[in-house]
From Swiss-Prot:
This is Protein REVEILLE 3. It holds the Pfam family RVE6. Keywords: DNA-binding, Nucleus, Transcription, Transcription regulation. Residues 56-110 form the HTH myb-type domain.
């Protein structure tokens, strides 16, 4: 007969560890709240979205001096809105800085209501090759359907056609040079063409760039006063020679300025107000 020993346990207790398992002491790990929130946010974010870099000012803004602003105003009178030429005239600012300064200046003038010179806005450029449109099927009638022409006058004062077509006929009573008509229309001066032939022989739209417009205008260029006064000072220096050669090598505007100043100087020296100066100069010559 088998007897059960009450001291022996039928099963292993819960706190007893098996050999080879759970040998390390149990430690509870806690995740910080910030890490858990970041993990939650990263789970819902789009993985393809790029991380935006923080905005940093790489270059500090440079204030305009009074001399630079005066040059800017003078260049605005000369070149209107040709920013590249204004940049070359000012010399110390970029095109972007000049355009930004001009925008602020225009807003300030409009707000104050002062009568300052503001250059007109640039005309919108038309396409060199506009998208072809189907010609409307109109019957030939002389009472309606005429072209409305606009003319762009260039420097040689010849009109050039450069506008849109509204109806089906071309009115040829306007005095246009025959060379322009033959080149653009391919017909004689007193002939009219329908819209279909007009589409086959489309006129080239004249678009003058800003450089061409500026070339047509007479620009005032300031003389180089350093060179002018240097030459006038060398005239009274007995050690300096070759004045005629230097005059020939000068720019026309510098040469004109030198001659004008020398003429004014000679007129002033002949006036009675400079008698003492003339006597002083003659005493040096006598000695």
């Amino acid at each position: 007969m088998v007897t059960v020993n009450p001291s022996q346990a039928h099963c292993l207790p819960m706190k007893m560890s098996l050999p080879g398992f759970n040998t390390l002491p149990h430690t509870a790990t806690t995740i910080p709240v910030s890490i858990r929130s970041n993990r939650t946010m990263s789970f819902f974010e789009d993985p393809t979205k790029k991380v935006r870099k923080p905005y940093t000012i790489t270059k500090s803004r440079e204030n305009w001096t009074e001399q630079e602003h005066d040059k800017f105003l003078e260049a605005l009178h000369l070149f209107d809105r040709d920013w590249k030429k204004i940049k070359a005239f000012v010399g110390s600012k970029t095109v972007i800085q000049i355009r930004s300064h001009a925008q602020k200046y225009f807003l300030k003038v409009q707000k104050n209501g002062t009568k300052e010179h503001l250059p007109p806005p640039r005309p919108k450029r038309k396409a060199n090759h506009p998208y072809p449109q189907k010609a409307p099927k109109f019957t030939l009638s002389s009472s309606n359907a005429l072209f409305q022409h606009d003319y762009l006058y260039n420097t040689n004062s010849h009109p050039v056609i450069s506008t849109t077509r509204k109806h089906g006929l071309v009115h040829c009573d306007v005095s246009i040079p025959s060379s322009v008509i033959k080149e653009e229309f391919g017909v004689s001066e007193n002939c009219c063409s329908t819209s279909s032939s007009r589409d086959k022989q489309r006129t080239r739209i004249v678009t003058e760039t800003n450089d061409q417009e500026s070339c047509g205008k007479p620009h005032r260029v300031a003389p180089n006063f350093a060179e002018v006064y240097n030459f006038i000072g060398s005239v009274f220096d007995p050690k300096t020679t070759g004045h005629v050669k230097r005059l020939k090598e000068m720019d026309p505007i510098n040469l004109e300025t030198v001659l004008l100043l020398m003429k004014n100087l000679s007129v002033n020296l002949t006036s009675p107000e400079f008698d003492e100066q003339r006597k002083l100069i003659s005493s040096y010559n006598a000695s």
